[in-house]
Amino acid sequence: VLLPKQHILLLSHMRAYTSLFSHIIGSNPAVCGYYEMHIGYHSWRSLLRQKLLYFRDEEVKTGFSCMFDKVLHNDHAVSPSVLLRPNTRTIFSLRHPRDTLPSIVTLYQQVDPTNEFNSPDYALDYYVNRLTALSGIATNIEQPFYYLDAEALVENAGECLGSLSDWLR
């Protein structure tokens, strides 16, 4: 159980259809993980920690071979050494700010009116800082990664998921 063959990490930002993506990939019987663990990945030990935390609350799928997680915040660092592991696959996904920023503000106005994300300026700072961090990560890994246009997941799901499936094989 503690040694799946593969890890998939989605590196993105809030409101980029990552929940949709997570439910799609998590519906695969070979994949365990469909929600954000809210942890960093600092070394290979973090991959083990992910499994321990996940299986504390979730059942092991029969025949699973892959763990999935998404990292959406700079508070949860991801080390290049983790992304460079031969059994780790990295997916980056971005959504256009024109749609992302109002979506962040609207969400927090509904769920927590006192949250800082109610401010368009705060949401913009988060988005810019997150994209800067993602750019730095992408620049520093020498292993191929997959870029998923968040809008394509909704607007052209079949082609998008087909391409991703081919890449994951």
What residues fall within each predicted segment?
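PAPS-dependent sulfotransferase catalytic core
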Residues: 1-65
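A generic secondary-structure signal marking the coil-to-beta-strand transition
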Residues: 6, 64-67, 89-90, 144
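Short beta-strand segments
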Residues: 10-12, 67-70, 147-149
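Generic signature of intrinsically disordered, low-complexity segments enriched in small/polar residues
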Residues: 20, 24, 37, 44, ...
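A general marker of short, structured functional hotspots
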Residues: 50, 69, 122-123
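Glycine-rich phosphate-binding loop used to anchor ATP phosphates in small-molecule kinases
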Residues: 60-80
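PAPS-dependent sulfotransferase catalytic domain
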Residues: 73-169
